Amino acid sequence: IGRLVGSEMCIRDRYIIPTPIGNLRDITYRAIEILKKSDFILCEDTRISRKLMEKFDIKSKLLPNHKFNEKKNLSLFINHLRNDKIISLISDAGTPGISDPGAILVRECVEEKINIFPLPGPSAVSTAVCISGFSEKYFFYGFFPSKMKDIKNDLKFLTQLNSSIVFFISPKKVN
């Protein structure tokens, strides 16, 4: 995991920066500061991220990093880090790498011994758990598969757990 020297960022560092879920004003001052100092910001959807950048006058270059190009761009991103560039990873909402792109790049950074510094912030999982009334153990599942057969198989497994279960459903699928 990454580090700070004094209050300055280290070169060749990569930051995982949670973004607001719903209300742009929920972002932290520290997140804004690091985003402004980043050479590149890897984001899921540049159209969505641009709204956040404009709101807080962040001029760093946005590079798309989504499930369709994440593997293809991996060597480019690692090369930027090797050239002492500061890269921040954000998602459209919440914490990157949790049911969002980012895990592939994190794994590669760990293998390459490139510092990773996660910032605390919004997480849909912790937000859901804190208002559920179940404060003890829980199991985070992620998104359900798209095929009903796979959903049924997964539900068989999940019903065997002795804990609360948190899962995501796309807003497009909720009716």
Where do the protein language model's features map onto the residues?
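Single conserved hydrophobic/aromatic residue that forms the stacking wall/gate
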Residues: 1-11
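Loop/turn-to-beta-strand initiation segments
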Residues: 14, 84-88, 163-164
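Short glycine-rich anion-binding loops that position phosphate/pyrophosphate groups of nucleotides
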Residues: 21-22, 92-96, 171-173
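Conserved helicase motor
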Residues: 65-70, 144-147
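Glycine-rich, highly charged phosphate/nucleotide-binding loops
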Residues: 69-77
